[in-house]
Amino acid sequence: LSKYFTVAYIPLYTDISFIPGVLNLTYVQNSGAAFSSFEGQQWLFALIFLFFTGLIVWEYFKKKMAFTPFERWCIAAIYGGGLANMVDRLRMGYVVDMIETAFMDFPVFNVADCFITCGCVLLMGHLVLFNKAFWKDKKK
């Protein structure tokens, strides 16, 4: 929904102050990955997305890896954000970005990017802090 409303109501490259001094809404078309790297490589991103989807399915079904509910939520956030961006890439050739930090110089991003980042950080933190199998393998 955030991408739809951005495209429908904010002209391209226009800044709208959302929370003055904190957040702006800025419609940007990003044909690359993070920080606009690898611009125009939509099929590379599709292959990477499919690879990680396959990896998750492999871990879950073939290795009988049991994910905790928290880990499933993290994986769902990562996968959902990736899927949302992938749909944009394949449908339009770019990802709609709209969130700009006004208080620091940082690339414009979108809600899906937030889900991917939060899911990754929380999953890694959870695995390091609470996954006994992670530490058991490292002690050998």
Where would I find each of the regions flagged by the language model?
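Alpha-helical transmembrane bundles and membrane-interface segments of multipass inner-membrane proteins
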Residues: L1-K140
